[in-house]
């Protein structure tokens, strides 16, 4: 058992009381009130300040300076080091989510002690048990299922509730403490892909190779003349000092570049920063790109020398020998390919909702302005045809020769600088099988039917076992963030299928209610760790996330609890190698200092709180070496070049078993798929439903913080043109529904969303009634579990619904 000191319920309530009173009395200015209290305490020299971090999944990490008195966090500040200039060692200022960390630590939803389910999964009925009882139950379940089904039956579920830590890190699965533990006892069923980037990661890999397509650093837009953002919204998704909003503002001011936003929703990255917003129907980006390409080809605005030297498949000259005649991109665009349709602006206007004249103007702007920074966020690809969309958008910088130069980009989202800080070793996984992260529910009910050709299984031809045990660490993806909640609920309620669900978390989330064993985890504030994967554009940094307070109640760090579990499984020495958590951190830090000699000593870093390093090579330019010398620095594609036509995809399209309306194509074409604009299902459900990331939360993290919920209420966005015939007024309670479920939520009537589309931010905590109607605005009641064709990823923006006033 751990020897960690605990905080009592009495102390916990004391620490929460000021925040609770504030939540009732003054929700509008909580941070100002707390600042006055902190100033008074500082004057009396009764506080100390300890460095910590916000380690949620917003795209980076942010330092927090915790004010502590009598083992209680009284106030949270952020980085106060460095400059205000983005390409120097600038201050990494946490957003209001990170600064509300105290409200996460002292939240009424905190898990306080180990618990065991006593009702049905999802009912949230548990009884308190001891740590020894909990770990014994887990050990027995692991032994029983491994003996009966093998290690392939043990699954590490996708979860990003704590990211970037060295010890406290929930994703990717192979880098977690649970992976290290499982590898000590024979391994586990892994997953590949992620809910953020499944389609683009696979799609652009076939274009650029290397497993993950790179982009120029966002700071490099100071060298550009034109910025075109397809669904890229850092002002909400990456809004902190560890994000990119401030960087964009400063870099754009230096370049004076025109910025065009292409998005169904007028997002906060616009908000007056943009020069033009072009609304587009969701899922039609590839049609727009095809029409832009048509104009650029017809008006000789493409970079033919670049296409000839660096690319495969643009025209007949570079088409692979195994491709059919007229199988190249130019033929597809001009209408002498297989479909025989010229991709004119008039053709695209009917699909995208963008007038043909504006398409022509945009094509000329992109084709005649160089360099141009063209990038896509991760929203456009999160669709049923998302792999094709991601590849299509990348065609714009390829056609115009903007790849590998300053001020240009690849069409991918921006990349950033990183430093070689050593990670915690997690040992080798003996299990070879890996499933698409989105198909874990299928792996429960039909695991042994899933194959490489039908379901994208990797490492083996076919799964040998269904999933019988799930580790769910810092994850709300078991229910809340996974699609089609009602189907998942039905699968998980049958505990003869998946026999054990173990959740390790800080709070009683929607997912936690489906657990068999609940283990209360320490927050970042209650343990020592390093926060890694921290960067913004051309600066990387590491945060010393020190232990700010003692663990609350019976909460324990994950390394501590797994060390005891390893002892019950007879592998403690292999798991710990005789080190405590702090001893591991000191060991890793000394290894990191060998790679980064400029790092201070451990104790100096502990006082300093943050280590920053600016890229000595200046702004990042993706594939610059390839552009400078393609023979010496080929891409990691079969041809070594940019593959507009992919022979690998042509082969997959022939051999994989696909649904009739699934499309895998060697070219980045526009293809309709399920629940798209123009689908016959629109007769019943005429509105497209799209999700977006909301500044009130990071996915579902911070979704239970009172002041953030009050400042940013959950609403569905609807255009006045759609609201008027339904007699819906701003603020009305409405029902959104389809065959998969129903949500009741207040409506925001706004011209900031294109007609024919409603938008609902993801991450709201699922709150069903007895009829399965959700009252929180959880979009995943309405999304589908049907995967995308190639990545087998989550198409959570491909939804058709109807909306009615209640």
From Swiss-Prot:
Predicted to be exported by the Tat system. The position of the signal peptide cleavage has not been experimentally proven. Its cofactor is [4Fe-4S] cluster; Mo-bis(molybdopterin guanine dinucleotide). InterPro entries: Anaer_DMSO_reductase, Asp_de-COase-like_dom_sf, MoPterin_dinucl-bd_dom, Mopterin_OxRdtase, Mopterin_OxRdtase_4Fe-4S_dom, Mopterin_OxRdtase_prok_CS, MopterinOxRdtase_cofactor_BS, Prok_Mopterin_Oxidored. It is a peripheral membrane protein. The keyword Signal applies. CDD domains: MopB_CT_DmsA-EC (cd02794), MopB_DmsA-EC (cd02770). Mo-bis(molybdopterin guanine dinucleotide) binds at residues 163-167, 196, 236-237, 262-263, 283-285, 378-379, 382, 480, 504-505, 693, 699-701, 780, 796-797. It catalyses: dimethyl sulfide + a menaquinone + H2O = dimethyl sulfoxide + a menaquinol. It comes from the Bacteria. This is Dimethyl sulfoxide reductase DmsA. It comes from Haemophilus influenzae (strain ATCC 51907 / DSM 11121 / KW20 / Rd).
């Amino acid at each position: 058992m751990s020897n960690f000191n605990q905080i009592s319920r009495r102390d916990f309530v004391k620490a929460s009381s000021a925040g609770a009173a504030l939540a009732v009395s003054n929700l509008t200015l909580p941070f100002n009130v707390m600042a006055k209290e902190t100033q008074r305490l500082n004057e009396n020299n009764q506080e100390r300040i300890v460095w910590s971090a916000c380690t949620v999944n917003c795209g980076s990490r942010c330092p927090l300076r915790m004010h502590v008195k009598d083992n209680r966090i009284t106030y949270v500040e952020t980085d106060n080091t460095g400059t205000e200039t983005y390409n120097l060692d600038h201050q990494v200022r946490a957003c209001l989510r990170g600064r509300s960390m105290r409200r996460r630590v002292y939240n009424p939803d905190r898990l306080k002690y180990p618990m065991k389910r006593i009702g049905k999964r999802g009912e949230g009925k548990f009884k308190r048990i001891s740590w020894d009882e909990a770990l014994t139950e887990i050990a027995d379940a692991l032994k029983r299922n491994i003996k009966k089904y093998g290690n392939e039956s043990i699954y590490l579920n996708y979860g990003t509730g704590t990211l970037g830590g060295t010890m406290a890190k929930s994703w990717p699965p192979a880098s977690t403490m649970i992976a290290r533990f499982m590898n000590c006892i024979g391994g586990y069923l892994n997953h590949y892909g992620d809910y953020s980037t499944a389609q683009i990661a696979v799609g652009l890999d076939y274009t650029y190779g290397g497993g993950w397509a790179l982009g120029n650093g966002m700071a490099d837009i100071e060298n550009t003349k034109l910025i075109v953002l397809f669904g890229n919204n850092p002002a909400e998704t990456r809004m902190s000092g560890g994000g990119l909003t401030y960087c964009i503002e400063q870099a754009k001011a230096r370049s004076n570049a025109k910025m065009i936003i292409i998005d169904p929703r007028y997002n906060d990255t616009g908000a007056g920063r943009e020069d033009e917003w072009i609304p587009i129907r969701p899922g039609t980006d590839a049609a727009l790109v095809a029409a832009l390409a048509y104009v650029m080809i017809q008006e000789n605005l493409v970079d033919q020398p670049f296409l000839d030297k660096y690319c495969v498949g643009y025209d007949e000259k570079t088409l692979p020998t195994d491709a059919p005649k007229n199988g190249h991109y130019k033929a597809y665009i001009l209408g002498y390919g297989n479909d025989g349709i010229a991709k004119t602006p008039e053709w695209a206007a009917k699909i995208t909702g963008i007038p043909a004249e504006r398409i022509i103007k945009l094509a000329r702007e992109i084709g005649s302005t160089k360099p141009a920074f063209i990038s896509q966020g991760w929203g456009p690809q999160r669709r049923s045809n998302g792999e094709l969309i991601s590849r299509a958008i990348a065609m714009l910088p390829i056609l115009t020769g903007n790849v590998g130069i300053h001020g240009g980009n690849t069409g991918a989202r921006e990349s950033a600088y990183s430093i070689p800080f050593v990670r915690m070793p997690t040992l080798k996984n003996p299990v070879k099988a890996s499933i698409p992260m989105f198909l874990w529910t299928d792996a429960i009910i039909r695991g042994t039917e899933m194959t490489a050709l039908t379901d994208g299984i990797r490492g083996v031809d076919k799964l040998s076992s269904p999933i019988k045990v799930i580790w769910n660490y810092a994850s709300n993806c078991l229910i809340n963030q996974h699609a089609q909640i009602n189907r998942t609920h039905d699968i998980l309620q049958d505990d003869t299928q998946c026999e054990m669900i173990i959740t390790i978390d800080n709070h009683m989330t929607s997912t936690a209610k489906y657990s068999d064993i609940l283990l209360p985890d320490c927050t970042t504030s209650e343990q020592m760790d390093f926060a890694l994967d921290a960067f913004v554009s051309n600066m990387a940094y590491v945060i010393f996330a020190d232990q700010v307070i003692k663990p609350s109640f019976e909460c324990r760090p994950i390394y501590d609890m797994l060390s005891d579990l390893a002892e019950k499984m007879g592998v403690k020495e292999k798991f710990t190698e005789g080190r405590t958590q702090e001893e591991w951190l000191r060991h890793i830090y000394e290894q990191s200092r060998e790679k980064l000699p400029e790092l201070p000593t451990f104790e100096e870093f502990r006082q300093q709180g943050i280590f920053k390093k600016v890229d000595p090579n200046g702004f990042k330019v993706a594939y610059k070496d390839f552009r400078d010398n393609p023979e010496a620095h080929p891409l990691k594609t079969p041809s070594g070049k940019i593959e507009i036509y992919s022979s690998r995809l042509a082969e997959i399209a022939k051999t994989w078993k696909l649904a009739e309306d699934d499309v895998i194509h060697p070219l980045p074409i526009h293809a309709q798929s399920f629940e798209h604009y123009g689908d016959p299902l629109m007769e019943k459900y005429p509105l497209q439903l799209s999700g977006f990331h909301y500044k009130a939360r990071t996915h579902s993290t911070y979704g239970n913080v009172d002041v953030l919920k009050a400042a940013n209420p959950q609403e569905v966005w609807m255009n006045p043109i759609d609201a008027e015939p339904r007699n819906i007024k701003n603020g009305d309670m409405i029902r959104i529904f389809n065959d998969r479920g129903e949500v009741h939520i207040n409506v925001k009537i706004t011209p900031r969303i294109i007609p024919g589309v409603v938008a609902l931010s993801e991450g709201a905590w699922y709150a069903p009634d007895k009829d399965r109607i959700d009252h929180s605005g959880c979009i995943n009641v309405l999304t589908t579990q049907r995967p995308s064709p190639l990545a087998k990823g989550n198409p959570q923006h491909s939804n058709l619904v109807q909306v009615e006033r209640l």
